[in-house]
């Protein structure tokens, strides 16, 4: 079978358009537009690209974007002080600190300093805990974006045998919680997993997030499986590929996400959704 392509670019644009309409309605009703503060420390080229795409998305949907570009020499205390200021600012609904941070700054301490109701990345232990307890508030962006893709393609996840490859805090672990909420029987594999092929071959829904090009051969994919490839890997020739061997997998799967243009755009779209949610539900409820 030839897999149907899950077009993340188109779905992400739909999500952003829906948010833009809600923002326009808020402003027309005399309410403020949501505000998102994006903090970049240092000059990591990849981080600069990610931050630029997030700021552009903000502007497109009518948010008020607050940019904080700090030098590489910024101390942890200075960064924490900025977060305290942003936490206290009633015009800011979301705070995003771009990772990775320079050496000498504790990522965990910084992420935990962000007020949970402004944690639009969904990384704060409070928000992760809420997701674990089946009462989510702000949800981690990439896992939530993947669930949105499945929903928009009317894929019924109840009862599916789901396998997540990779157990990172950003994707793998929260993804497993989202899949449990979506009614899947969920397995998470990691570097100590024995017989990875066996797990992949029995997956009705496979989500791969390891950051290694071509890590999963197409021949491992179960006939008719749904394949979600979170990997974004740039080869020496400049080509961007995922963690799954795409052409081989697409010949066996029923649905598959391409790289690029699959999961990536949904991460930013979900960040935008989370910021609107934070504004309406936690900071400016009269806008409901």
Curated annotation (Swiss-Prot):
A GO cellular-component term linked to this record: cytosol
CDD domains the record matches: NAD_bind_m-THF_DH_Cyclohyd
Reaction catalysis annotation: (6R)-5,10-methylene-5,6,7,8-tetrahydrofolate + NADP(+) = (6R)-5,10-methenyltetrahydrofolate + NADPH; (6R)-5,10-methenyltetrahydrofolate + H2O = (6R)-10-formyltetrahydrofolate + H(+)
Pathway: One-carbon metabolism; tetrahydrofolate interconversion
Pfam families per the UniProt record, alphabetical: THF_DHG_CYH, THF_DHG_CYH_C
GO BP term, example: L-histidine biosynthetic process
GO MF annotation terms: methenyltetrahydrofolate cyclohydrolase activity; methylenetetrahydrofolate dehydrogenase (NADP+) activity
Keywords, comma-separated and alphabetical: Amino-acid biosynthesis, Histidine biosynthesis, Hydrolase, Methionine biosynthesis, Multifunctional enzyme, NADP, One-carbon metabolism, Oxidoreductase, Purine biosynthesis
Lineage top rank: taxon: Bacteria
Record EC number: 1.5.1.5, 3.5.4.9
InterPro entries: Aminoacid_DH-like_N_sf, NAD(P)-bd_dom_sf, THF_DH/CycHdrlase, THF_DH/CycHdrlase_cat_dom, THF_DH/CycHdrlase_CS, THF_DH/CycHdrlase_NAD-bd_dom
SUPFAM superfamilies: Aminoacid dehydrogenase-like, N-terminal domain, NAD(P)-binding Rossmann-fold domains
Record's function text: Catalyzes the oxidation of 5,10-methylenetetrahydrofolate to 5,10-methenyltetrahydrofolate and then the hydrolysis of 5,10-methenyltetrahydrofolate to 10-formyltetrahydrofolate.
PANTHER family, per database record: C-1-TETRAHYDROFOLATE SYNTHASE, CYTOPLASMIC, C-1-TETRAHYDROFOLATE SYNTHASE, CYTOPLASMIC-RELATED
Family: Belongs to the tetrahydrofolate dehydrogenase/cyclohydrolase family.
Subunit structure: Homodimer.
Name the UniProt record assigns to this protein: Bifunctional protein FolD
Lineage: Bacteria, Pseudomonadati, Pseudomonadota, Gammaproteobacteria, Enterobacterales
């Amino acid at each position: 079978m030839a897999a149907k392509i899950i077009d993340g670019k188109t779905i992400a644009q739909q999500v952003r358009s829906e948010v833009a309409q809600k923002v326009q309605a808020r402003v027309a009703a005399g309410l403020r537009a949501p505000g998102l503060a994006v903090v970049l420390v240092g000059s990591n080229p990849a981080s600069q690209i990610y931050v630029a795409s997030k700021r552009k998305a903000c502007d497109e949907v009518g948010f008020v974007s607050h940019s904080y570009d700090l030098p590489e020499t910024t101390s942890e205390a200075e960064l924490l002080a900025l977060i305290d200021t942003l936490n206290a600012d009633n015009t800011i609904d979301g705070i995003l600190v771009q990772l990775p941070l320079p050496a000498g700054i504790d990522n965990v301490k910084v992420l935990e300093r962000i007020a949970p109701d402004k944690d639009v990345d969904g990384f704060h232990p409070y928000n992760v805990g809420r997701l674990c307890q089946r009462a989510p508030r702000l949800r981690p962006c990439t896992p939530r974006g993947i669930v949105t893709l499945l929903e928009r393609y009317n894929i019924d996840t109840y009862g599916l045998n789901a396998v997540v490859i990779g157990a990172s805090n950003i994707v793998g672990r929260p993804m497993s919680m989202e899949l449990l909420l979506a009614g899947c029987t969920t397995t998470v594999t990691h570097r100590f997993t024995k017989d990875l092929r066996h797990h992949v071959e029995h997956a009705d829904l496979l989500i791969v997030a390891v950051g290694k090009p071509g890590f999963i051969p197409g021949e491992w994919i179960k006939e008719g499986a749904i394949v979600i490839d979170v990997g974004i890997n740039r080869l020496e020739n400049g080509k961007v590929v995922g963690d799954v061997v795409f052409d081989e997998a697409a010949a066996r799967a029923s649905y598959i996400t391409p790289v690029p243009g699959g999961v990536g755009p949904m991460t930013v779209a979900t960040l935008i959704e989370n910021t609107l949610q934070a504004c309406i539900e936690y900071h400016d409820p009269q806008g409901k």
